[in-house]
C-alpha cells in the first residue's frame, strides 16, 4: 500500500511535467510561466518552496527541542513576516518593475536597475555558490524518513528524488513546477494537520501532552520548572534570531522572489497574499508546534549520538503504516518543490546572467532554453553528490546548512533588492558592499567560527545579523558614494507612473 501511494504520486508529477511542455518553449515560458500564473498556483509555489525537509525535519526538531512550544513563534513569524509582509511590501512593486526592466532573474534585475554588468555577474556567482548547501540539506532530511518507512538505502533516495525532479522540471519548466507545487501543497496541508492530531492523540491529547511537557526539566538548559511549555522558552534571544533568519530571509532569496515575477495580475497578488499567509501558518506553525513536543520522547532520542535531525523521525516512528506513508509523501513533496525552485533559479541565472552575458552574447532563445535544461541536470547532479559527501562528513545538522545558505544569500541581496524597488538613491557601491559583506561573513563563519563572538558562532544567528546589517549598510553607503545615473533611475521608476485602464469591478473610478 505504501509503495502504491508513492508510485501513484510519482506518476502524477511526471504526467504534469509532460503536459506542461507547451509552456516551456522560450525563456519567459520556461523560467516564469509566461508571467501568467494565477493566485493559487503562485501562493502554493511560494509556500512549498519556502518549507521543505529543512523545516519539517531540521528546524522543527532542533528548535522544538531547544525552545519547546515557544518554537511555534518561528512559524508565526514565517506567516506574518515571511509571507504576509513579503507579499505586501515586495509583491506588487517587484512584478511591475521586473516586467518593465524585462528581467527574469534577480541578477538580471540588478544589472538592468543599476546599469551594471559586473553587478549582474557578481550576483549570479553568489547565487550559484550558496544555493548548493541548501539543496544538499534537502536530500538529507528526506533520507531519514524514507529509511524509516521503506528501509531504502540513502543513495537510492537521493537518486530517486533527483531523477523525478529533473524529469518534470526539464519537461515543463516553471509551469509544471507551479502545478506540482499546488498538488504538493495540498498534501503538505493535509499531512501536517493529520500528523499533529495523531502525535498528540498518542500522548493522551493536547492537555495531557502539554502537562507532560511542563514537567520536563533539563538543568543544562534552564532550572526553571515548565520552561519548555512557557511562552518564550528558555532562550528568547536566540529564538528571535531564528525568527529573523527564517522569516525575513525569504525577502532576499532568489528562488522565493522569483515567484512574484510570474504572477498574473493585481487581483492575483491580493488573493495570493491571503492564501500564502494561511498556508505558512498551517505548515510552518504546525511543524514548529509539533517539534515543540519533541522532549516528550527524550527517553528514545540521543541527540548527542544521532543529531537533532533524528527527533521528528523518532516522534513519528510509532504511527500506522498509512500515516508514515503520508509523512514520507509530505516531506518528499516539500523537498521536491523546493529543489525544483532552486534548480530553476540557479540554471536560469547561470544561463542568462553568466554564460550569455560573458561568453555567448548572441545566444538564441532556443539555445538559452536548452542551456537552462542542461544546467538543471548539472545542478541536481552536483547537489546530489554533495548530499552524499555531507552525509558522511562531520556536518550533520540540516539547520546549519540552511543557515549558511540563507544567511549568505539574504545577507547579500535582501537590502539592495528591497531598497532598489522603493528608493532612487541606492547606489551600485552600496549593492557591492552588501554583496561582499553578506557572502564574506558567512564564509568566514564556516572556516573561522571559534573566533567569532559567542552570539555569532551559530550560522543561524550570523545569517540573521548579516541581513539586519545590510538594511543599515545600504542607506549609509549610498549617502557617501557617487549618485546613480539619474536617467537610468528615472527610467526604472517610470513604470510606477504608467496609466492602466481597469474595469469598474476593480476600481470605482471618479
Short names for language-model regions:
Residues 1-510:
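Membrane-embedded helix-loop-helix hairpins and adjacent transmembrane boundary segments
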